Amino acid sequence: MFHRLTLTAAALALSVSAAHAAQDTITLGMVLEPPNLDPTAGAAAAIDEVVYANIFEGLTRFGPDGAVLPALAQSWDVSEDGKIYTFHLRTGVTFHDGTTFDAEDVKFTLDRARAEDSANAQKALFAGIDTVEVIDPATVTVTLKDADGNFPFNMAWGDAVIVAPESVADEATNPVGTGPFKFDEWAQGDHITISRYDGYWGTPAQLSKATFRIISDPTAAFAAMMAGDVDAFPNFPAPETLAQFSTDPRFKVIVGSTEGETILAMNNRQPPLDNVKVREAIAHAINRQDIIDGAMFGYGTPIGTHFAPHNPDYVDLTGLSAYDPEKSKALLAEAGVSDLTLRLALPPPTYARRGGEIIAAELAAVGIKTEITNVEWAQWL
C-alpha cells in the first residue's frame, strides 16, 4: 500500500491590466527553473511550462475544453479492432533548424520513448505500442498490443511531443521543435527566452518574444509584479499578498482550480513505514486544512484521491484519513512503534517548505519527530 495525503492547490495567476494588451512581447514570472528543456526526458512540470505547445508539438493536442484535436497529425483512422492507428501528417512542416518534419520523425520519437533505456517520465504512455511503421513521408501506422481508445489522448501529452533525430542530442539545452516559438537563450538562474518562429505551419504567434523570469522567492515575486518587471505570474508563490493586488487597478488576479496536487509520499519499503498502521497514524496526525491555511493562506481544497474536485469522477474520500490525533496515537501503539524519527525531504516551492513545517509540528504532537531536509528540484525528482 502506498499511502498519500493530498491537497489540490488553487491556481493563482497575476497579470497586468488590459492597458498593456497591445504589446507584442511578454515577461512571465516562473517559480521553478526547469532542470532541462527536453519534455521527453524529464518529469518536472516546469519543462512543459516553457516548451509545451510553444516550442514542441505532438501528433495531437488538447483543446481548451480538454478535447483531443489534430496537431502534427491532421487526421487519423482507427481499425475496426481498435488496435491500428493510421496518422495522416501535415506536410510543409519544418523544425526550427530547417529540418523537414515527416513520418520518420514520428517513428523515431515513439521508438525512442518506448525503448528499454528510455528516460521518458511517462514511459507507460507508450508501453502499449507494438510496432510503428512508416507508410510514406506523410503517413505512419501505429499498431497497439491491445485496443486503446485513449491512444490519441496519450499522444497529446507533453511527454509525447515529436523530436527529430538530427537535434535530439541537444534538446536539454537547445530545444528544437515545430511549434510557433523557437528557443533563443537560457541564462540559467535568471531567464529563458523564446521568440516567434516565422516558418510556423499554423497560425502565427501574436507575440514576437516571451521571456520566462525565474523568481523563486515570494518576496521577490511580489516586488517584481509591483515594479512592473514581469507582466504576468502564473502559479504565483505569495498568496498572502493577493489582497494587495486585488485592490490595485493595475492588476488582475485570477484564482481557479487546478489538477495540481500537494502530496506527502511515504517510502513504504522502509521500516517502520512498511507497517500500514504507522502510515495510517501519520495520515490521521495531519490536518490538511491547517496546511492550506498556513502555507497557502486558504487557497486549496483537501482531497483524498488523485482527482481534483472539479473532475466529474471525483469522490470525496478525505474521511478515510481524517484528522484525528488520538486515533494516530492509538495506531502507533498498536503497531508497537515509539520514539520514531522520520526524515522529511522538501522540494523548493514555498507551499512545500511552509507546509513541511506545519506537518512536522503536527507529527510532533503525536510523538513523531522529523528531520527536515530541504532539497533542490533535481534532487527531489
Regions found by a protein language model. Give the residues of each.
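Alpha-helical secondary-structure segments
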Residues: 27, 102-109, 137-143, 179-180, ...
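Ligand/substrate-recognition segments at binding pockets and active sites
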Residues: 28, 188, 312, 329-381
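N-terminal lobe/hinge region of extracytoplasmic solute-binding protein
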Residues: 29-80, 111, 176-178
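Gly/Pro-rich hinge or "lid" segments in bacterial periplasmic/extracellular proteins
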Residues: 67, 147, 153-205, 209, ...
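Aromatic- and charge-enriched surface segment that lines or borders ligand/interaction sites
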Residues: 74-119, 135, 141, 272
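Surface-exposed binding/hinge segments that line
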Residues: 88, 122-165
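Ligand-site clamp/hinge motif
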Residues: 169, 197-243, 360-361, 369-371
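Structural transition elements
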Residues: 267, 297, 301-334, 351-354
